[in-house]
Amino acid sequence: MKRLTVLLISLFLAASAIAADPTIEEIVNRANLATYYQGKDGRAHVKMTITDSQGRKRMRKLTILRWDQPDTDELENGAYRGKQKFYVYFSRPADVNKMVFLVWKNLDKDDDRWLYLPALDLVKRIAASDKRTSFVGSDFFYEDVSGRDIDEDEHELLKTTDKYFVIKNTPKDPSSVEFAYYKMYIHKKTFLPIQVEYYDAQDKKYRVAKALKVENIQGHPTVTKASMESLNQGSKTVMEYSSVKYDTGIPEDIFTERYLRKPPRKYLK
């Protein structure tokens, strides 16, 4: 009887452990929430350092504002995927001062992206086909800044380690991207992607993103230092985030063409 009791307890504990493991959908959804949707809105100052293959460095300073809909952090309420708007204001160096990158993330169509060039007083619309191109000369792409729609890829759990869920993501439309697939190493506790590796059709790794520093800000695990390395070009970009703040009450009307030429100073400080 004692052996039977021990066996039943062991089976119960094993079943509980299996039930506790999140599904691939839950992992991907939580990772998207942790990366792009924490808080109802957000603001961060960013220092971007671009290092080319010769070791030459260029620096940019910018501020990122974000607004979400729905304004929730509840996973069951769709917080991991919703309409979202980004306003990226550049302050340094002089040649990019007052330049603005604006994004409207849409659920039922391609995202809308605009770039305001103050020297020309020109608002340039960025085509959907250009989302996988360099963001202001860095190793990050436009899509890296605002995020890739999770429904654009098929997701497969390759393995689980003591720290990470390792996910393989394959595009549903291979012709729309330059990669064959990418792997994400998602932290099991925070659900933040700590490393993302991009592979080409020859199964060669050519691009690597890393979360170099994570801090807890207002209860949200937040990446405050990240890098993107282009292995083929030998270049690397590091982004350092400071003065990060969530739930600031940023109004939606800031994320319009009117504010491309009239920066919302109050929220950029």
Language model region names:
Residues 6-15:
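Bacterial N-terminal signal peptides
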Residues 159:
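Short, contiguous, pocket-lining structural segments
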Residues 249-269:
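Gram-negative outer-membrane assembly/targeting C-terminal domains
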